[in-house]
């Protein structure tokens, strides 16, 4: 089968638009900590699966390099003034100090400017980014932009603290509207910059669910968050830019809302939402980039992994398309299981973009 760059892009777009893709686009995401642990043995697996890793070249990964400060052991303060702490090199940390934990700090608080401040340090080089997008397009690749993970809902509790935000929402604290507007304005400015540069797809990530339920009721989601996503995603759709939304956690009750807001590709977790829940609430309505069960991968036998992937494909795929697969492998996943994941994905699908 032809897996050229042009064919991969055409197939990816066919999957998004339910126009009979030739194969299911599949990806395997390897965390920095996973590379640090397995090193050359992991690279051997990657090199033996060029269908899943079509652009990887031997030696192109520095096993010890951690570019994102959020993935380095220790602490740092982001552009919003949120203090992060990380106990595991190569995995993401968490916010431990919240600049707006007291409402009394809100009036004097000045949010960052995304045009001149990167969220995790540094100044964005927009000219370089513009040229990179042009180069990707000239190569027949997808020109992709995006906001940092956790840019709307999660940023609210990064600023207030999770418990405080839950109380704010439960009690309909009037000050919440000002906080939401501030974060939304930041995001709108960021999105408009990407749209000005010219992108084909915008990536958004916000973990809207807990393990087995929403953290807030669907009604509260529709009151406080849905209008934000509708505005953010609507800007993209007006420019014919695809909207990709990643969300960890259980989101079944709000999938229709997210589609209404303009999501083209939804990246939900299979364990939190179940295959059956996604068949009922998402199949045929939106392209599903299914996050395979990362909580299964560390402990399963290769045969259990095979059955898991095959079952998801059997129930969620259709000839029209609308399905992609992604497997994220943390450092607790045995090499044998990573090999199995890659092999089975090659059996059921082909490369992504």
Task: Label each residue range with its predicted role.
Residues 5, 41-47, 106-109:
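Generic hydrophobic, helix-prone segments enriched in Leu/Val/Ile
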Residues 40-44, 71-76, 304-308:
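Short, surface-exposed amphipathic charged segments that create phosphate/polyanion-binding patches used
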Residues 26, 51-58, 77-85:
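Secondary-structure transition motif
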Residues 1-36, 86, 110-353:
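Active-site loop segments of alpha/beta catalytic cores
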Residues 66-118, 138-142:
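A contiguous, low-structure linker/loop signature
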């Amino acid at each position: 089968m032809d897996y050229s760059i042009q064919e991969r892009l055409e197939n990816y777009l066919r999957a998004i638009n339910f126009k009979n893709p030739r194969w299911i686009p599949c990806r395997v995401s390897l965390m920095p900590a996973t590379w640090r642990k397995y090193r050359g043995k992991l690279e051997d697996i990657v090199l033996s699966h060029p269908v899943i890793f079509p652009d990887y070249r031997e030696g192109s990964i520095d096993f010890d390099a951690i570019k994102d400060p959020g993935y380095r052991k220790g602490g740092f303060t982001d552009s919003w003034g949120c203090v992060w702490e990380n106990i595991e090199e190569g995995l993401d940390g968490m916010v431990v100090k919240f600049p707006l934990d007291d409402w009394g700090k809100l009036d004097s608080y000045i949010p960052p400017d995304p045009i001149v401040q990167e969220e995790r340090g540094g100044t964005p080089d927009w000219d370089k980014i513009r040229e990179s997008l042009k180069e990707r397009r000239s190569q027949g690749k997808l020109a992709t932009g995006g906001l940092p993970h956790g840019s709307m809902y999660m940023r609210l509790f990064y600023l207030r603290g999770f418990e405080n935000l839950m109380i704010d929402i439960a009690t309909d604290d009037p000050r919440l509207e000002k906080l939401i507007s501030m974060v939304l304005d930041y995001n709108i400015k960021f999105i408009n910059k990407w749209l000005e540069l010219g992108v084909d797809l915008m990536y958004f990530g916000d973990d809207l669910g807990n393990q087995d339920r929403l953290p807030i009721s669907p009604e509260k989601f529709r009151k406080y968050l849905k209008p934000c996503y509708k505005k953010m995603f609507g800007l993209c759709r007006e420019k014919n830019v695809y909207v990709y939304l990643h969300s960890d956690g259980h989101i079944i009750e709000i999938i229709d809302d997210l589609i209404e807001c303009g999501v083209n590709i939804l990246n939900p977790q299979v364990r939190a939402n179940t295959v059956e829940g996604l068949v009922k609430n998402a199949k045929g309505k939106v392209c599903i980039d299914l996050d395979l069960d990362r909580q299964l991968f560390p402990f399963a036998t290769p045969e259990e992994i095979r059955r898991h992937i095959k079952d998801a494909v059997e129930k969620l795929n259709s000839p029209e398309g609308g399905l992609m697969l992604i497997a994220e492998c943390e450092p607790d996943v045995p090499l044998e299981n990573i090999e199995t994941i890659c092999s089975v994905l090659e059996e059921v699908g082909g490369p992504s973009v």
